[in-house]
Amino acid sequence: MIERPSGIKIEKFSPTLGAIITGVDLSQKISDAQFNDINQAFLDYQVLFFKDQKEIPPELHIEFGKKFGELHSHPAAPTMEGYPEIFEIHAHKDSKIANGEFWHSDVSCDKEPPLGTMLQLHILPETGGDTMFSNMYAAYDELSNKYKEILDGLIAIHESEHIYKGRYSDRGVSEDKIETPTAKHPLIRTHPKTGKKAIYVNRTFTTGIEGMSKEESSSILNFLFNHCEHVNYQIRYRCLLYTSPSPRDS
């Protein structure tokens, strides 16, 4: 465990990905020193689990998020009344969907996808409800140099209509109120601060590769989907009440 001068303690979660953060109360305003340590841990470990938390008021949830940059509003999902930056998820045993049932990178269909996502759980099931994350830096590193050369410069197409259309209708979201964006992103992206390269495709939103036929792009994408979902790159975490996992799309 590493303890920073700000009082924040960082414990590595696994050799692959993630860290557990203690020594900070996100239900209160945090200092610049605390944020700097959190942000560095975010860069180092990609997924942070904040333990021993109280319920975070929406205003502070938003204030904390804004420390990372401009906040993203979901193009289709229901949001908290008065707080469009907060996406509310409600699911029960009879729900047609929960959320994030399949591997994905959050809203990669947007022209400027979010840096990451901050989650807080208010109600937990007695069993289940685990969340899994996969490390796209590690997945890239394990590719052969020749395959990296093939992928370098390719542009992936990300679409959302097949996902968002009708998805939230049972939660009172009208079809004429949603957006179904499409975007193109480099298949291999480089982090602007760390310089690390990551695979940026996912089974939910990525539908093709620019300049390739469906058959050509499918062969590459299906290989990458399976490769990125390999257990070697994964972690699984069961959240406690009010635990806040903050994943990077990596």
Where are these regions (language model features)?
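Fe(II)/2-oxoglutarate oxygenase catalytic core
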Residues: 2-241
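Conserved small/polar residues in nucleotide/adenosyl-binding loops
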Residues: 242-249
